[in-house]
């Protein structure tokens, strides 16, 4: 299945049903009073995270989602039926952005998590709501309010513990094939990997972590060269980055300059991502003698000003891979995700009609006090009054 990590959709919540103006009419009850019911609320639009999905490709074809309108109120104090909600399932790791305001509405980080993205319109009020001691035959009603309408951008960001960085042909896909059951394509030409892939590294029956492989970066990626840096967003939630360096590039390029290019593109994309823990991993040491590989790795680390520990591996022969994985596992255990590091959810997403009824009824009470001397009768020729008609 094609990997799609961005999609734009339109969500429209249902309008609220209108209130009803009606008076009770039964045998022997000539003046039964008002009995107009309220309308029904409009349906909401929800997003729900589903761990069984891994792409947004469905929303490249189906782009519009509309909830049901609430039914109008009826006589005999019958309330209109509420509109049906619409639930849109998205992969875990999806970020939701309102394109109209640029607001991040939320991050779908857990299976089953639900997020309301469009709130249905409030129901209109029937004339029963407006009866009082001075207004016994109210002809007022209110109309249902329109539902929210939003253009949303869905961005899928893979959830992984470890992310891999490197130039094309640095051996990232070979590494993920060696440590997990993932089988990304491997070949001797650049940009073999065109889309991100995930692999689960199982150290034993109880310990495991997830590693993400993204397409390689080249100089100018921030300006769109190669595959650009659009896939770097998949590393934003990783706890540690493995920077793979081809210790003996087949094209004769300088490993030091290659490493600096990756660091530079990382900083151009995001300072937060550049500040994440990053480990230096020299790959393809099987192409050199051990002494020569050690000498070259030391020289590269010194040229980069690297003072921390670095690793020497061969993903193809799996030399040094197990020790690296155990160190990664230990780091993950010692640095669990804390609440402050998780994506911050907005405290409250503002919708159009959150305070509509409270404000509306307050206005009606004020009007009733002003009109205490009105003496309406059900036979009056006055028309129905609409409160806050839009």
From Swiss-Prot:
Renumbered residue ranges of the record's region Disordered: 127-147
UniProt GO molecular function: GTP binding; GTPase activity; magnesium ion binding
Keyword annotations from UniProtKB, A to Z: Cytoplasm, GTP-binding, Hydrolase, Magnesium, Metal-binding, Nucleotide-binding
Keyword Magnesium found: yes
Compositionally biased intervals (Polar residues): 129-143
Keyword field contains Ribosomal protein: no
The Obg domain, residue ranges: 1-159
Pfam families attached to this UniProt entry: GTP1_OBG (PF01018), MMR_HSR1 (PF01926)
PANTHER family, per database record: DEVELOPMENTALLY REGULATED GTP-BINDING PROTEIN-RELATED (PTHR11702), MITOCHONDRIAL RIBOSOME-ASSOCIATED GTPASE 2 (PTHR11702:SF31)
Family of the protein in this entry: Belongs to the TRAFAC class OBG-HflX-like GTPase superfamily. OBG GTPase family.
Protein name, UniProt field: GTPase Obg
Source taxonomy: Bacteria, Pseudomonadati, Pseudomonadota, Gammaproteobacteria, Enterobacterales
Gene it is expressed from: obg
């Amino acid at each position: 299945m094609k990997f799609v990590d961005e999609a734009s959709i339109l969500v429209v919540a249902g309008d609220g049903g209108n209130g009803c103006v009606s008076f009770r009419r039964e045998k022997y009850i000539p003046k039964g009073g008002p009995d107009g019911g309220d309308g029904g609320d409009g349906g909401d639009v929800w997003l729900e995270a589903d761990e069984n999905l891994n792409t947004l490709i469905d929303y490249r074809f189906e782009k519009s989602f509309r909830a049901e309108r609430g039914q109008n109120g009826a006589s005999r104090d019958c309330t209109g039926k509420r509109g049906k909600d619409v639930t849109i399932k998205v992969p875990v790791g999806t970020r939701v952005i309102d394109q109209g305001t640029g607001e991040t509405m939320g991050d779908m980080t857990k299976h089953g998590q639900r997020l309301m993205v469009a709130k249905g319109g409030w129901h209109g009020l029937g004339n029963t709501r407006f009866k009082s001691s001075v207004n016994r035959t109210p002809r007022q009603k209110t109309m249902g309010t329109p539902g929210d309408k939003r253009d949303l951008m869905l961005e899928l960001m893979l959830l992984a513990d470890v992310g891999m960085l490197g130039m094309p042909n640095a051996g990232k896909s070979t590494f993920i094939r060696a440590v997990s059951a993932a089988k990304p394509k491997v070949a001797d030409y650049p940009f073999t990997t065109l889309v991100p892939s995930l692999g689960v590294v199982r150290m034993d029956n109880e310990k495991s972590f997830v590693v993400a492989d993204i397409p390689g970066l080249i100089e100018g990626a921030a300006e769109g060269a190669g595959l650009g840096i659009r896939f770097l967003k998949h590393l934003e939630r990783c706890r540690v980055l493995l920077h793979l360096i081809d210790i003996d590039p087949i094209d004769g390029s300088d490993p030091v300059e290659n490493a600096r290019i990756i660091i530079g593109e990382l900083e151009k994309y995001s300072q937060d991502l550049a500040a994440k823990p990053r480990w230096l991993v020299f790959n393809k040491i099987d192409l050199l003698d051990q002494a020569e590989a050690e000498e070259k790795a030391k020289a590269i680390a010194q040229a980069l000003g690297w003072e921390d520990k670095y690793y020497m591996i061969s993903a193809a022969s799996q030399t040094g891979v197990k020790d690296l994985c155990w160190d990664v596992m230990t780091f993950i255990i010692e640095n669990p995700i804390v609440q402050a590091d998780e994506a911050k959810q907005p405290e409250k997403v503002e919708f159009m009609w959150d305070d509509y009824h409270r404000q509306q009824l307050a206005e009606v009470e004020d009007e009733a006090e002003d009109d205490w001397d009105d003496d309406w009768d059900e036979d009056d020729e006055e028309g129905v009054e609409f409160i806050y008609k839009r």
